[in-house]
Amino acid sequence: MIVSGLSGSGKSVALKTFEDLDYYCSDNLPVELLPDFVKSRLRGNPIGNQRLAVGIDVRSRSDLTQLAQWRLAAQEYGIEALLLFFEASDEALIKRYADTRRRHPLSHLGLALPEAITRERQLTEPLRVQADAIIDTSTLNVHQFRRRVVTEFALGSNDRLSLLFESFAYKRGVPAEADFVFDARVLPNPHWDPELRPLTGRDAGVRNYLDNEADVRRYSTQIVDLLDTWLPRLRNDTRSYVTIAFGCTGGKHRSVYMAERMARHAREQGWPEVATFHREQD
């Protein structure tokens, strides 16, 4: 996976999302070093078992036109290199820079921000024209953006059903795109334990606390029975992924724990594409 685009459009968020899904990621890699990087990662490992994501943009200060030649050569070795190009409107980019107070990568040229954005569009045009997908992030918040990366690109091809286990806080609303929704507020709440309150459902302390609760074990068993029965029936559906969402009060402990627990179970059952997304944490 090659991640490129305009500075401020979300490339770093995309790479972090791929990293969370067990991709080996490298950012700001010069194009001329890409072949050696890929070879080093594939050495001694089957191509099908390697998931790489590389960030390439104007910071690399290399000849971006070389990328098309490398992608053609990579196909001969059975390497699929999908190029994603992220962009946003000038207005959205200027607002993001104002909010974060970061400097544009081309500011060293003595350009004002609008001129730097225009210049970057020109420099990255060789990448944009060969992109497999162009994603405009102007109107997306970070949660919508991460979800789109996960569901459309990171989970794999559309010829097999992928599972996305999500956690959320009810006070912020139920995810509209969820196919299954389970209420974890019926479970004991680690929030009331002062030592567990600052942790999340991914931390060992919270996991141990909930693992030892009889109601949690019963709740988990019943959900496993339901999902194991009905998820396989969806394999013949036209959809490419299914979202299973767990909600609790704050989206921090119980819902995160259940999403992670069910994702582990799905992987143990042999589902090839499984991801987690914690809306209030990621």
From Swiss-Prot:
UniProt keyword annotation of Hydrolase present: no
Entry keywords, A to Z: ATP-binding, GTP-binding, Nucleotide-binding
UniProt: GTP binding residues: D57, V58, R59, S60
Highest taxon of the lineage: Bacteria
Ligand binding (ATP): G5, L6, S7, G8, S9, G10, K11, S12
Keyword Transit peptide: no
Annotated signal peptide: none
GO MF annotations, alphabetized: ATP binding; GTP binding
InterPro entries per UniProt: P-loop_NTPase, RapZ-like, RapZ-like_N, RapZ_C
Family note: Belongs to the RapZ-like family.
PANTHER family recorded: RNASE ADAPTER PROTEIN RAPZ (PTHR30448:SF0)
NCBIfam families membership: PRK05416.1 (NF003828)
Task performed by this protein: Displays ATPase and GTPase activities.
Name listed for the protein in its UniProt record: Nucleotide-binding protein XOO1280
Organism: Xanthomonas oryzae pv. oryzae (strain KACC10331 / KXO85)
